[in-house]
Amino acid sequence: MKAIIFLFAVLTVVAIIIPIISGEPNAGPLAASIDLKQIMEKVKPDLLKMLDDIKAKIQQG
C-alpha cells in the first residue's frame, strides 16, 4: 500500500515539474524566477532510479 501512495506522490511531482521544464507559458512565476531546467537535469537520474525502485517493489508485491 505504501508503494502505491509513494507512486502517486512521485507522479504528482512529475506532473507538476514536467510542464515547467518544457517551458509551458502557464507554468507560473516559479519558471521565471528559478532555472528549473538545470535543477531537473541534476535530479532526473535520481527520479528515474526512484521510479525503477518503485516498479521493482510493486512487482515483488
From Swiss-Prot:
It is found in: Secreted. This is Myrmicitoxin(1)-Pm5a. Toxin that causes a rapid and irreversible paralysis when intrathoracically injected into insects (blowflies). Does not cause spontaneous nocifensive behaviors by intraplantar injection in mice. Expressed by the venom gland. Keywords: Amidation, Neurotoxin, Secreted, Signal, Toxin. Belongs to the formicidae venom clade 2 family. The keyword Thylakoid does not apply. The lineage of its organism: Eukaryota, Metazoa, Ecdysozoa, Arthropoda, Hexapoda. Its main location: secreted. Residues 1-23 form the signal peptide.
